[in-house]
Amino acid sequence: MNAIWIVKGIENVVKSNPKRLEELLANLRRDKELFEEIVISAYVEGLISLSKASELLEITRDEMAEILRKRGVPLRNLNKDDLVAEVEAIKWF
């Protein structure tokens, strides 16, 4: 089933009423498996960093890296967000 129209429809609704995005995200987060798939897909496409993916799933970066490894998803080189997160984690200790 080609459901590109759904994605376009969501995009249009969010453009006209940005507050609906939070509602949509809240609904997506209720289905943890689906939301995890979306986050992993965004990571694979390079749309978000490892740090952002772990933040969205409310897990540690190490847990996120393990999920990716189990799925056979290669880890990308650290970007600026990941490096900042690493420095902050080190400072915490």
Curated annotation (Swiss-Prot):
InterPro entries: UPF0175, UPF0175_domain. It holds the Pfam family UPF0175. Belongs to the UPF0175 family. This is UPF0175 protein AF_0100. It comes from Archaeoglobus fulgidus (strain ATCC 49558 / DSM 4304 / JCM 9628 / NBRC 100126 / VC-16).
